[in-house]
Amino acid sequence: MVEFHRSPDGVALHGREGLWLPYPVEYKKGSDKTQEADEVQLCAQALCLEEMLCCTIPEGSLFYGEPRRRTRVVLDESLRARTLSLLAELLENQARGHTPSVRAHKGCNACSLKDVCVPRLSRTGSVHAYMHARIAEDSP
């Protein structure tokens, strides 16, 4: 979600007076995590907004449903560099046609993509068997 806060450093919004600075808020079902994946996701969203709206977004928030609390995230140079580094790695893998192997872990059950997860799908057998099963599901 993106909130817009009135700011002299903001951008003009159609139908609104004044200048408004985008403030990305990423909602998460569970609680805060020790790894930085949520912060990187928020930063990637902010980078996209910055490019689309020609502005600089200094911070955003993560809202965790478990404690029902927002956590402020400063989008500093270190986080931006980490996010851009991961993006470069992703693009390199895509260009090579390479999908990195991933192991299932305890956080997988809370993931919104668990039903289409590559580690889980790869345990079901070959691509041919998977496609055959999906086609069979759609057949009358």
PLM segments and residue spans:
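Short, charged, amphipathic alpha-helix that recurs within catalytic cores of restriction-modification
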Residues: D38-E51
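Well-ordered beta-strand positions in beta-sheet-rich domains
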Residues: P22-P24, E39, R70-R72
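Short alpha-helix boundary/capping segments
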Residues: K33-Q41, L75
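Metal-dependent nuclease catalytic regions and adjoining charged, substrate-binding loops involved
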Residues: E50-P140
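Short, solvent-exposed loop/turn segments at secondary-structure junctions
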Residues: D32-K33, R70
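Conserved catalytic cores of phosphodiester-cleaving nucleases, focusing on short active-site segments
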Residues: M1-D32, A44-L47, C111
